[in-house]
């Protein structure tokens, strides 16, 4: 018998080695976004209104290639609202399936960026954002459209110090 024939015996272990570049190219790919839960002393949630969407969002945005989610969050906060804030604990991980306009799934992270004493420090990135505001949690969730579940989940996670996973949110 040849070595090839031995490899075909029932129960024989075959080599399944695949070149790393081929293996990794075949793995799932997803977009990564990171947002921040920022509240005022009254517990109202900061939202921004992008000029390219119908609904409001938590401040944040897409991660650059090979950028950690918390670094993306800090960068986006500085770019979008002009604030260099400490990005604190992870509150929410949300997964959304691919859609017609977005052909990959999205994994979104929400981090705690603390309590902001006053909105006077906020400087909007005017080429992307039309408005901002602090809203009661229920009002904030209503303005988020399809990702509304992130607001109560983030507030609950902040209170309990336990991150929340949201599938399809």
Each PLM stretch: what is its role?
Residues 40-79:
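Conserved Nudix-box catalytic region and its N-terminal flanking loop in Nudix hydrolases
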Residues 38, 110-114, 133-136:
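Short, well-ordered beta-strand micro-motif
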Residues 25-28, 101, 124:
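Short Gly/Pro-enriched turn/cap motifs at secondary-structure boundaries
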Residues 2-35:
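Acidic, metal-coordinating catalytic segment for phosphate/diphosphate chemistry
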Residues 54-55, 127-169:
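Nudix hydrolase/Nudix homology domain
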Residues 96-121, 154-155:
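Active-site-adjacent beta-strand/loop module that shapes the phosphate/pyrophosphate-binding cleft
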Residues 84-93:
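A short coil-to-beta-strand element that immediately follows conserved catalytic motifs
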